């Protein structure tokens, strides 16, 4: 007891010492030094008892009364003017609090006194949100019955049904949503849509009329950043909203986006170069208030922002330099514009002059042709040189040349000039003045080889006047190709009716069309070089200027005699006004010297055709190998020829031959003047005359000449077909050979003029007087010729397009067909005789011509014998028993079907076995997996038990230690009690 009293005295002493220390500190404080009046002025008035009186605001008193459920006090406060919708610091009203407290009586009392059932707190929660979250079904029903909205969203974009956890509450709210027809998605996006509309309006008006929130000072940019309205954020930034605007607490939009973890909003603000180091009133940066998972993203955005800021600075410097350069270059542009305006009247005058010269040259060519190539060059040289107006703002264009064409051409020079007049301005230049260096670079040529040729030929051209180089990409090539396709269609129709011979019309046309197509594809410089080499090889002087190297509508022959020129003019007038197939049926008028245009061409036909064939061979493109098709067609053709030739020579054939021979004799008597030597000289010089435009120069006189067979075949074909006249549709040549006068001559004139010595009527009888030796020799020659012809035939058939091939079906014999075939055979014999006369020399004798006729007859008989053997083979093939073949094939097919069915059955059996094996394997694997799963579960259960046991062991050790400690304390207390008891 004495010890306890001693301890109590010590405690009292220490308490007195602490109190004394407090008094000492009070005496030295500033409060103790203030006057007593000031200290008492700020205190509450004293009551009677002397204690101060505390006063609360009316709103706080009202909320406290509602919370306590004192309805009488609430009525008194409402009577004194208290606001029933007053809120506390969190925005909660009395209705919110009554709903949270589940006080249905107070809820009814407040609603009856006109409390707002849709009032939202600071987080956007309405009383219905609170009731749905707490699960108070009766309060929620009461709110709904009294007009509470089920579509209001809180700050998180949640409607009351999203907060409901109990199924009954969720069903109630969803049913009400359907009943009221509320679109929840639209409700969630309503705020964003409203902000989007306002942002667009501000962007269009250029004026931002935003109102800060009264409580926090937040702006629309803060709300868009915090809620992740990316589109609204972009529009506000585009409208010029201040990126670093701060609310009342100093928070920027980046603070809000970082705090609420909106990554996209942070990226948009950072890319817009907002300040990422700005601090709020508490000294916090966006990194300090950011969500933990967003800090790294903000650091990356800061690095990216530094790069963007540096790029923007360099871009601004470049823009300033560009503006300076544009200001400096404005002066030069204005000067060049003035120069351009001065040159415009000159270009208009030059266009008018070009049109006049084009029309005059076209009319002149329709009336007559030029006498030599020099006249063509002079007219071409009279045309002004074209240049392109150059300025800094216009792209350079290549110069094109317009050359007047004949009236038949669908693409005339005047239309070409109209086409190019809108694209080019052509100021007139002095003719003796060389163009400047920068204008020379605008010339367009076929290839770089053209430049050297232009440089070499510039001096002589400048003497005659400024020349125009035609562009290799001239639009006239397309017109030429179109006309060539039309002509090919007509010729293919003719060739289908003509007899199939080695040198038939269709074959020659096929070869020449292919050659012309290849030549058209080549560039201008290549063809120009080719013509130059061939001219040197023929040793004929060439005076063609480079200005007309692709002028396919103006080529004329440079070397002609006066008589040839007259014949050319006459034939040209006829060809320009009469269609091709009509001209073929009439002889041309004679010239002043009595020489027709027909024998002029008949001298060098065969030799030139051989030479042309040898030269053309290198220009043909490789073709596909269709050996099977060619063999089939050759076999069918031989069968048809066998059917024709085995009939023998009929009376109709003999009558036709007599009529032809008598007609030729009468014409030969009408032309009694000997023309052998003039024919030779004129044929060498004037044969390359062109009555239609051609792409081949004049130096290839004999090269493009076609064989006799072409003219001989075309004459009877045109007689039979009676080609309609087409004056409105000109025939443009596709190859050199189609532009030769051989198309305009009559076949009987051709072979009549071959014979310089008149034949006697005994030519019919001498045909049958050949010897056996000559027969054998001719048969050997015929075998060689047939072998060569078969090879060429297969090559020709491989080249022929499918649309031009004849049908190979069964032919039915008719009388008309037999007569036609007979006439064709007679014409073929005449063709062979003429070719022998032609190869025999320039002065053939009558006996040689008779021998050729006999040899031709012998060859024809040998051919008939060979074809007869082929026919017998075909008949043997036709005698096969196709019924047996069909039956054997049918039985074989049936056997194969049975084998196929057996194989299918075996395959199905094997598949079923494989499926069974796979199923067994799957079952085994599933059993194994189930066993393994059970083992894993048992292992996990044992591991859990072991862990629980270990925890229990730990608790047990702790309990043991606690028990030991309690025992020790108990012993100590016992000892103390024992001492005190003493």
Curated annotation (Swiss-Prot):
One CC-aspect GO term: A band
Tissue specificity of this protein: Detected in skeletal muscle, fetal and adult heart, brain, placenta, kidney, spleen, thymus, pancreas and lung. Isoform 3 and isoform 4 are heart specific.
CDD domains membership: IPD_MYPT1
Domain of life: Eukaryota
Gene3D superfamilies membership: 6.10.140.390, 6.10.250.1820, Ankyrin repeat-containing domain
UniProt region (Disordered), positions on chain: 1-50, 342-517, 556-579, 606-864, 918-948
Ranges for the ANK repeats: 57-86, 90-119, 123-152, 216-245, 249-278
Basic and acidic residues bias spans: 1-24, 375-385, 482-491, 623-632, 656-680, 824-836, 850-864, 918-927, 933-948
Keyword terms, alphabetized: ANK repeat, Cytoplasm, Cytoskeleton, Phosphoprotein, Repeat
Positions of modified residues (Phosphothreonine): 445, 646, 808
SUPFAM superfamilies listed in its UniProt record: Ankyrin repeat
Residue stretches of biased makeup (Polar residues): 389-401, 743-755, 840-849
Regions of compositional bias (Basic residues) in chain numbering: 633-643, 797-807
MF terms (GO), sorted A to Z: enzyme activator activity; enzyme inhibitor activity; myosin phosphatase regulator activity; protein kinase binding
Pfam families (alphabetical): Ank_2, PRKG1_interact
Location within or outside the cell: Cytoplasm, Cytoskeleton; Cytoplasm, Cytoskeleton, Stress fiber
A Gene Ontology BP annotation from the UniProt entry: regulation of muscle contraction
Composition bias, Acidic residues: 362-374
Modification sites for Phosphoserine: 29, 839, 947
SMART domains assigned: ANK (SM00248)
Function: Regulates myosin phosphatase activity. Augments Ca(2+) sensitivity of the contractile apparatus.
Subunit structure: PP1 comprises a catalytic subunit, PPP1CA, PPP1CB or PPP1CC, and one or several targeting or regulatory subunits. PPP1R12B mediates binding to myosin. Isoform 3 and isoform 4 bind PPP1R12A, but not isoform 1 of PPP1R12B itself. Binds IL16.
Name this polypeptide is given: Protein phosphatase 1 regulatory subunit 12B
Source organism of the structure: Homo sapiens
């Amino acid at each position: 007891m004495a010890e306890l009293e001693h301890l109590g005295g010590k405690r009292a002493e220490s308490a007195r010492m602490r109190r004394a220390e407090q008094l000492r500190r009070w005496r030295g404080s500033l409060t103790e030094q203030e006057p007593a009046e000031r200290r008492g002025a700020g205190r509450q008035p004293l009551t009677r008892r002397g204690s101060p009186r505390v006063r609360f605001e009316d709103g706080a008193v009202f909320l406290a009364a509602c919370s306590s459920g004192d309805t009488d006090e609430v009525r008194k406060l409402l009577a004194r003017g208290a606001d029933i919708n007053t809120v506390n610091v969190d925005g909660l009203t009395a209705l919110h609090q009554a709903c949270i407290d589940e006080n249905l009586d107070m809820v009814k009392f407040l609603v009856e006194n006109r409390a707002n059932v849709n009032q939202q707190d600071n987080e956007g929660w309405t009383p219905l949100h609170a009731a749905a979250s707490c699960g108070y079904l009766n309060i929620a029903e009461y709110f709904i019955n009294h007009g509470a909205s089920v579509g209001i969203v809180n700050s998180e974009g949640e409607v009351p049904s999203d907060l409901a956890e109990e199924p009954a509450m969720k069903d109630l709210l969803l049913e009400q949503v359907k009943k009221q027809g509320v679109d929840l998605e639209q409700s969630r996006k309503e705020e964003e849509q409203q902000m989007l509309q306002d942002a667009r309006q501000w962007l269009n008006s250029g004026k931002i009329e935003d109102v800060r929130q009264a409580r926090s000072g937040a702006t629309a940019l803060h709300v868009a950043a915090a809620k992740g309205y990316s589109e609204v954020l972009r529009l506000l930034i585009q409208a010029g909203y201040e990126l670093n605007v701060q609310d009342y607490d100093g928070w920027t939009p980046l603070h809000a986006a970082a705090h609420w973890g909106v990554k996209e909003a942070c990226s948009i603000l950072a890319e817009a170069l907002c300040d990422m180091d700005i601090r709020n009133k508490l000294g916090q940066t966006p990194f300090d208030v950011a969500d933990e998972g967003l800090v790294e993203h903000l650091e990356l955005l800061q690095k990216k922002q530094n790069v963007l800021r540096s790029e923007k600075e360099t871009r601004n410097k470049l823009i300033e330099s560009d503006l300076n350069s544009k200001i400096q270059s404005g002066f030069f542009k204005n000067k060049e514009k003035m120069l351009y305006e001065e040159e415009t009247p000159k270009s208009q005058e030059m266009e008018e002059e070009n049109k006049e010269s084009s029309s005059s040259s076209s009319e002149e060519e329709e009336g007559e042709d030029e006498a030599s190539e020099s006249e063509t060059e002079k007219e071409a040289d009279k045309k002004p040189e074209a240049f392109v107006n150059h300025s800094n703002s216009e792209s350079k264009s290549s110069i094109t040349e317009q050359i007047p064409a004949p009236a038949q051409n669908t693409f005339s020079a005047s239309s070409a000039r109209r086409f190019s007049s809108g694209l080019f301005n052509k100021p007139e230049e002095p003719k003796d003045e060389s163009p400047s260096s920068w204008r020379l670079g605008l010339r367009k040529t076929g290839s770089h080889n053209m430049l050297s040729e232009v440089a070499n030929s510039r001096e002589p051209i400048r003497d005659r006047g400024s020349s125009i180089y035609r562009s290799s990409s001239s639009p006239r090539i397309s017109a030429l190709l179109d006309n060539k396709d039309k002509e090919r269609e007509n010729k293919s129709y003719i060739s289908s009716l003509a007899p199939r011979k080695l040198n038939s019309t269709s074959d020659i046309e096929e070869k020449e069309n292919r050659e012309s197509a290849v030549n058209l594809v080549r560039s201008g410089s290549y063809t120009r070089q080719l013509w130059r080499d061939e001219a040197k090889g023929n040793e004929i002087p060439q005076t063609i200027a480079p200005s007309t190297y692709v002028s396919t509508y103006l080529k004329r022959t440079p070397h002609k005699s006066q008589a040839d020129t007259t014949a050319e003019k006459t034939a040209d007038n006829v060809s320009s006004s009469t269609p091709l197939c009509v001209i073929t049926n009439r002889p041309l008028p004679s010239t002043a010297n009595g020489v027709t245009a027909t024998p002029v061409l008949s001298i060098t036909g065969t030799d030139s055709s051989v030479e042309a064939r040898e030269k053309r061979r290198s220009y043909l493109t490789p073709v596909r190998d269709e050996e099977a098709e060619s063999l089939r067609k050759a076999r069918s053709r031989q069968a048809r020829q066998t059917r024709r030739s085995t009939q023998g020579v009929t009376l109709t054939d003999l009558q036709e031959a007599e009529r032809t021979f008598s007609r030729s004799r009468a014409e030969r008597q009408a032309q009694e003047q000997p023309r052998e030597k003039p024919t030779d000289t004129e044929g060498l010089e004037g044969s390359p005359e062109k009555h239609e435009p051609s792409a081949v120069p004049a130096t290839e006189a004999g090269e493009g000449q076609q064989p006799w067979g072409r003219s001989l075949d075309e004459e009877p074909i045109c007689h039979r077909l009676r080609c309609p006249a087409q004056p409105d549709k000109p025939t443009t040549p596709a190859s050199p050979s189609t532009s030769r006068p051989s198309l305009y001559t009559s076949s009987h004139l051709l072979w009549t003029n071959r014979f310089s010595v008149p034949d006697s009527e005994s030519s019919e009888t001498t045909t049958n007087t050949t010897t056996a030796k000559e027969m054998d020799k001719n048969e050997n020659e015929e075998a060689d010729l047939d072998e060569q012809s078969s090879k060429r035939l297969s090559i020709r058939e491989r080249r022929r397009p499918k649309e031009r091939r004849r049908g190979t079906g069964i032919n039915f014999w008719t009388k008309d067909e037999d007569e036609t075939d007979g006439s064709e055979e007679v014409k073929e014999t005449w063709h062979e005789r003429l070719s022998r006369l032609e190869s025999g020399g320039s002065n053939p004798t009558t006996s040689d011509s008779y021998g050729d006729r006999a040899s031709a007859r012998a060859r024809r008989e040998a051919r008939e014998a060979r074809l007869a053997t082929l026919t017998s083979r075909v008949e043997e093939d036709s005698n096969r028993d196709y019924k047996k073949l069909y039956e054997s094939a049918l039985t074989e097919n049936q056997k194969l079907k049975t084998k196929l069915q057996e194989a299918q059955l075996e395959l199905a059996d094997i598949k079923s076995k494989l499926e069974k094996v796979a199923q067994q394997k799957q079952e085994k694997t599933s059993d194994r997996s189930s066993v393994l799963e059970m083992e894993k579960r048992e292992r996990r259960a044992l591991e859990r038990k072991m862990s629980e046991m270990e925890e229990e062991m730990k608790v047990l050790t702790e309990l043991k230690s606690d028990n030991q400690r309690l025992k020790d304390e108990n012993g100590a207390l016992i000892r103390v009690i024992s001492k005190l008891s003493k």
